[in-house]
């Protein structure tokens, strides 16, 4: 079908009104009346890999099934960016499927993922475009082989006969089918969301082709469940009217995971509103949950190779656990109740600086009642890689004879930050001279490979000083100065 300009114009108008977020403040994710046996997940690209991770690691939750578009086998990258961009995308002949099956069984026996027996009755829908130049069809072939070890062949549908590039496929919205590019949604005259949902759930009512109620879209506070780790502060949901507060319907739940460069910050609400899921949700009482990565995450991708955590594919993976917590919350109601908004923590008081050296400064503050941790900001940029549980922090890697300003925010047990403190300033001491530092200029990715830096939450941090170097990728370049063993600061050599 040709691009639907009327629908595109309407969608554009809606997004113009809403902007990147909503005209309303984000609310807490509601607790709804959900049949927990009817919980499924699907995703595209990095979201496809994440959908597989959730389906396998949390198989007790997602036993009903999963839909995967341009994804790959569980733990395909084995914690390596080289594997991720190589065998798991471009060169699928190198995928060690039998090893990945063995790892799955081992982890299940250790309890770090759910028992694989939960997958025995799952439904799985797989899709690969014949023109996909990002995740080759051979990767999806390997995924089918992987699933053959756990899911009956009769329960798997694999569609790979549409000349589509790397995109979420629809029947009336997006780029031409053979186009690769933002928003990575393509009109291929095929309702992929509908095909997946009908395979996962069986016969469904006809979709709603009319304009969907604006009030059914909810922007929720994602920071209740996770802070940083490559995830945004808010997520989205589509809640049919019968499933909302006060409704009597018992509803299904489907988790939708966007691909790289497809979050709200990248493509506004196009993936949330125009991929076809909500039309089916509206007439079949299916709540659609759209978790969001942040633009700070590597390429806005989900963590399917370990850019944020070595445990990325286990139940303990930060992004995995956050999405599971969202599912648990939205499934915990008996009739659409919404938890009260939390009381924001007050700003820390008594923020001060002390103990200046040529390259460091100690920052202290008074404890805040109810705070689980604190975050320290220098000149409005967060400097601590991990939550600070004490009431002091030493900021390192500073330039000599330079004045800086620090503020502090308290965070609750969910990582939600309170108000910002008053600023405290301090000036580092003059350099004492002596010695010759070694400087290296390279991409953030190269710095991490060489051990001069590390990646966390989609950002790169200098080893030792923990200075924030920006996004973890091959495009951002920094010069790191080694001032002592395993200690690097951002700077230049004289």
UniProtKB/Swiss-Prot annotation:
User: How does changing the pH alter activity?
Assistant: Optimum pH is 9. Is stable for pH values from 6.0 to 10.0.
GO CC annotations, alphabetized: extracellular region
Keyword Signal among UniProt keywords: yes
Record's subcellular location: Secreted
Q: How does activity depend on temperature?
A: Is stable at temperatures below 37 degrees Celsius. The stability of the enzyme decreases sharply at temperatures over 40 degrees Celsius.
Looking up InterPro entries in the UniProt record yields:
AB_hydrolase_fold, Esterase_phb, FN3_dom, FN3_sf, Ig-like_fold
**Fibronectin type-III domain segment(s):** 347-431
Signal peptide segment:
1-25
Q: What class of enzyme is it?
A: hydrolase
Q: Which CDD domains match?
A: FN3
Pfam families, per the entry: Esterase_PHB (PF10503), fn3 (PF00041)
**Reactions the enzyme catalyzes:** [(3R)-hydroxybutanoate](n) + H2O = [(3R)-hydroxybutanoate](n-2) + (3R)-hydroxybutanoate dimer + H(+); [(3R)-hydroxybutanoate](n) + H2O = [(3R)-hydroxybutanoate](n-1) + (R)-3-hydroxybutanoate + H(+); (3R)-hydroxybutanoate dimer + H2O = 2 (R)-3-hydroxybutanoate + H(+)
Query: Its induction, per UniProt?
Result: Induced upon growth on poly(3-hydroxybutyrate) or poly(3-hydroxybutyrate-co-3-hydroxyvalerate) as the sole carbon source.
* Chief place where the protein resides: secreted
One annotated GO molecular function is: hydrolase activity
More about this protein: Poly(3-hydroxybutyrate) (PHB), a homopolymer of (R)-3-hydroxybutyrate, is a storage material produced by some bacteria, that is used as sources of carbon and energy.
Described function? Catalyzes the hydrolysis of poly(3-hydroxybutyrate) (PHB) film, producing the monomer and dimer of 3-hydroxybutyrate (3HB), while the 3HB trimer and tetramer are not formed.
Q: What is this protein called?
A: Poly(3-hydroxybutyrate) depolymerase
What phylogenetic lineage does the species belong to? Bacteria, Pseudomonadati, Pseudomonadota, Betaproteobacteria, Burkholderiales
């Amino acid at each position: 079908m040709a691009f639907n300009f009327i629908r595109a114009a309407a969608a554009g108008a809606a997004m113009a009104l809403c902007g990147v977020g909503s005209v309303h403040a984000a609310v807490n994710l509601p607790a709804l009346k959900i049949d927990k046996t009817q919980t499924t997940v699907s995703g595209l690209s990095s979201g496809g890999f994440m959908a597989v991770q959730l389906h396998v690691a949390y198989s007790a939750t997602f036993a009903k099934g999963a839909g995967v578009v341009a994804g790959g086998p569980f733990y395909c990258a084995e914690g390596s960016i080289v594997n991720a961009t190589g065998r798991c995308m471009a060169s699928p002949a190198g995928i060690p499927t039998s090893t990945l099956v063995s790892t799955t069984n081992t982890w299940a026996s250790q309890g770090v993922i759910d028992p694989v027996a939960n997958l025995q009755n799952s439904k799985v829908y797989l899709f690969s475009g014949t023109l996909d130049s990002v995740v080759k069809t051979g990767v999806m072939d390997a995924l089918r082989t992987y699933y053959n070890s756990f899911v009956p062949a009769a329960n798997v549908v694999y569609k790979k006969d549409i000349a589509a590039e790397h995109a979420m496929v629809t029947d009336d919205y997006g780029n031409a089918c053979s186009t690769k590019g933002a928003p990575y949604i393509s009109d291929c005259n095929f309702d992929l969301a509908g095909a997946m949902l009908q395979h996962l759930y069986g016969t469904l009512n006809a979709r709603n082709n009319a304009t969907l109620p604006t009030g059914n879209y909810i922007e929720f506070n994602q920071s209740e469940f996770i802070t940083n780790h490559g995830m945004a502060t808010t997520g989205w949901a589509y809640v049919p009217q019968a499933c909302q507060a006060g409704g009597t319907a018992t509803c299904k739940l489907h988790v939708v995971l966007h691909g790289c460069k497809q979050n709200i910050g990248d493509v506004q609400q196009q993936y949330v509103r125009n991929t076809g899921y909500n039309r089916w949700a509206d007439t079949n009482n299916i709540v659609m949950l759209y978790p969001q990565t942040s633009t700070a995450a590597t390429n806005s991708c989900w963590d399917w190779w370990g850019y944020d955590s070595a445990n990325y594919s286990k139940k303990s993976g930060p992004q995995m656990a956050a999405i599971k917590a969202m599912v648990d919350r939205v499934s915990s109601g008996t009739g659409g109740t919404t938890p009260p908004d939390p009381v924001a923590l007050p700003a820390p008081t008594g923020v001060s600086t002390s103990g200046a050296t040529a390259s460091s400064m100690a920052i202290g503050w008074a404890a805040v009642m109810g705070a689980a941790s604190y975050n320290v900001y220098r000149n409005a940029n967060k400097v601590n890689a991990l939550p600070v549980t004490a009431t002091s922090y030493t900021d390192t890697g500073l330039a000599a004879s330079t004045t800086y300003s620090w503020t502090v925010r308290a965070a609750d047990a969910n990582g939600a930050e309170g108000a910002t403190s008053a600023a405290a300033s301090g000036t580092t001491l003059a350099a004492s001279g002596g010695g010759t530092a070694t400087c290296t200029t390279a991409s953030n990715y190269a710095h991490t490979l060489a051990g001069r830096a590390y990646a966390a939450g989609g950002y790169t941090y200098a080893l030792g000083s923990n200075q924030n170097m920006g996004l973890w990728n091959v495009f951002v370049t920094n010069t790191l100065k080694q001032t002592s063993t395993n200690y690097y600061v951002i700077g230049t050599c004289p």
